[in-house]
């Protein structure tokens, strides 16, 4: 096999690969054996005709497709390895020469991983944000705990709807005098003042009593997300079925004992403050790492192939689809609710995808230049963490082995990138 390489443009190369005629003839014979049973030739039982008879009857190229596939699948990876290329997409194959008794010559045009030009990535300056825990922060946590443990009780007979009440309602909506999809519900639980419903819908229920009905008039936002409703005035027929109210528990030592391991409210507050401080430290660390990485990436020069960005967007869409699935939705529903489309979402994701790809390439460059590697022990430790998340149980060791076997390269790359980030942070300078 002979190969030639031509650089078409940045990150695109064309390989011309010559497969010797002997190899190509072997591939044709292999294709004959694979397909002979498909051919009917007069004078021969089906599947028994010799190769030369079949080619005479059906034409010289009858076995070329399979032979080409065989040769390309064998020769292309060898050429890639010979020229030390890192393809990021499937090659575009074109036939240059093919025929009986001839060498098989083809070209493979392929997009390769781009070269990153990066200098002076040590000692970058980045802003370090700091966050203090205030008494208000602790109070918010306590209030959330009180809300979570609140009792929902029915208000006394004759009481009217007030802000923060929970109104159980039936409603039916109309736009242009016609009921619309999703505009009707029975026994809907609506907390007044949360802004769950559009416009001033909730405010118009204040003062109503059980059994009373009201016509509520609102306007849908211009960007509501449904073309047939955007900016339209709407009328809702609403009936109050029941009025409930949250009864918060007393914030005392008994409450602290019920919801935590602590005997007093003061001890509970101290614990909440400690946890908030830990969360803030982690936030500061993550934000500083991101600031350092962003500064390093700004110093890097790299021309990212469009296909790498598109593949990253594909992954982001799959992640979105998975998260929507947890909510019982799919992408089609998401596009409808957000008045969008796949093309619009892909365009919206493009900037983030490009940033993620560039970060990956920059970290890869630093890993290579600094000779950073993940040890076997680190890979196994990460696999153990994953096994625990999967709930390995008694077969944890086997699960760890399976994870290492299937994802060794991925884990090694993740760990090396994490070490590269640590390296950049350790060699950076904090600025206020």
Swiss-Prot record:
Its main location: cytoplasm. It is found in: Cytoplasm. It catalyses: [protein]-peptidylproline (omega=180) = [protein]-peptidylproline (omega=0). It comes from the Bacteria. Keywords: Cell cycle, Cell division, Chaperone, Cytoplasm, Isomerase, Rotamase. It is an enzyme of class 5 (isomerase). Residues 164-249 form the PPIase FKBP-type domain. One of its GO terms (cellular component) is cytoplasm. GO terms for biological process: 'de novo' cotranslational protein folding; cell division; chaperone-mediated protein folding; protein transport; protein unfolding. Its EC number is 5.2.1.8. GO terms for molecular function: peptidyl-prolyl cis-trans isomerase activity; protein folding chaperone; ribosome binding. Belongs to the FKBP-type PPIase family. Tig subfamily. Involved in protein export. Acts as a chaperone by maintaining the newly synthesized protein in an open conformation. Functions as a peptidyl-prolyl cis-trans isomerase. HAMAP family: Trigger_factor_Tig (MF_00303). PANTHER family: TRIGGER FACTOR CHAPERONE AND PEPTIDYL-PROLYL CIS/TRANS ISOMERASE, TRIGGER FACTOR-LIKE PROTEIN TIG, CHLOROPLASTIC. Consists of 3 domains; the N-terminus binds the ribosome, the middle domain has PPIase activity, while the C-terminus has intrinsic chaperone activity on its own. This is Trigger factor.
